[in-house]
Amino acid sequence: MDLFEYQAKELFAKHNVPTTPGRVTDTAEDAKAIAEEIGKPVMVKAQVKVGGRGKAGGVKYAATADDAFTHAQNILGLDIKGHVVKKLLVAEASDIAEEYYISFLLDRANRTYLAMCSVEGGVEIEEVAATKPDRLARIPVDATKGVDEAFAREIAEKGHLPAEVLDAAAVTIAKLWEVFVGEDATLVEVNPLVRTPDDQILALDGKVTLDANADFRHPEHAEFEDRDATDPLELKAKENDLNYVKLDGQVGIIGNGAGLVMSTLDVVAYAGEKHNGVKPANFLDIGGGASAEVMANGLDVILNDSQVKSVFVNVFGGITACDAVANGIVKALEILGEEANKPLVVRLDGNRVEEGRKILADANHPLVVLAQTMDEGADKAAELANK
């Protein structure tokens, strides 16, 4: 989960990373009030999860509270690379002597953590990597050892930070590592990390990506969810612990196991070529649990997608046997009642498949169509979606 800057700075404050005071708001009037409270010049910053805010006019210096009001009026509603500004961060402006770059990230290619540091901050780091690669240090981090102040100083030194700020920078870099590990992040980035005229080190910006797989360890992270930007169906699925991704097709997909669901998407897309270009409407993996409740929740999400014209349930029985899946489908249809109003093609295979098919056949639900193979099921679901 990508965070807004103001949310990243909340985590920075939690771990004592030095930054500038400020508050988030969604009105120009409140922006003025915050500037008055701070009592000094402020920065009015658009809160969007995309780079290039400054070039797009989304970051402005305000010498007075009235300036903050005017800038807030202009920035709210601004479209920055397809992201409409709905919130602003009003933060105390800082005198800047130098700008640096620091980040910690998960280096998937090398299966390790990576620190990146550069004396060339305040610009796109990709530009530095392309034009001045020798100015960008990449330092692997041993997960078993982490980053203490001594190693943080080494990171700063390799990033060519001036000798007179190495100690202060090391303290901040070590605290940023605490954010990275303590919050189960996959990215913590500060650009710029600034040196003030009196040699303070401040995180003026912040970018944090949290690992959703660690949400169970951080219930407090739920408050960071951007509900306005999240598809309501994906939000509903997440609330029910369903692994769901919305796509742009007409055939709803339910399967058990990510590999089977991915294969089902391919087979449905192929079958759809014969039926006016019908495509899969979603990815939905119910995993090993096909209880009535899980199946009902999955169907509820898919059937609430107005684009869906048919549903293909493709399950291979293993630990969860096919008869349990079939009972789950029957009970789910009972639970949903009239909300279940689209044809449901079901293909079962594997453990206790005959018993599962018999349960569905005996139920004789008017919406349920049985298929013997995945290809047959995909073709039938695509055909029904094209009617």
Curated annotation (Swiss-Prot):
Binds 1 Mg(2+) ion per subunit. GO terms for cellular component: cytosol; succinate-CoA ligase complex. InterPro entries: ATP-grasp, ATP-grasp_succ-CoA_synth-type, ATP_grasp_subdomain_1, Succ-CoA_synthase_bsu_CS, SUCC_ACL_C, Succ_CoA_ligase-like_bsu, Succinyl-CoA_synth-like. ATP binds at residues 45, 52-54, 94, 99. Its EC number is 6.2.1.5. It catalyses: succinate + ATP + CoA = succinyl-CoA + ADP + phosphate; GTP + succinate + CoA = succinyl-CoA + GDP + phosphate. It is an enzyme of class 6 (ligase). It comes from the Bacteria. Keywords: ATP-binding, Ligase, Magnesium, Metal-binding, Nucleotide-binding, Tricarboxylic acid cycle. Succinyl-CoA synthetase functions in the citric acid cycle (TCA), coupling the hydrolysis of succinyl-CoA to the synthesis of either ATP or GTP and thus represents the only step of substrate-level phosphorylation in the TCA. The beta subunit provides nucleotide specificity of the enzyme and binds the substrate succinate, while the binding sites for coenzyme A and phosphate are found in the alpha subunit. Heterotetramer of two alpha and two beta subunits. This is Succinate--CoA ligase [ADP-forming] subunit beta. It comes from Mycobacterium sp. (strain KMS). The gene is sucC.
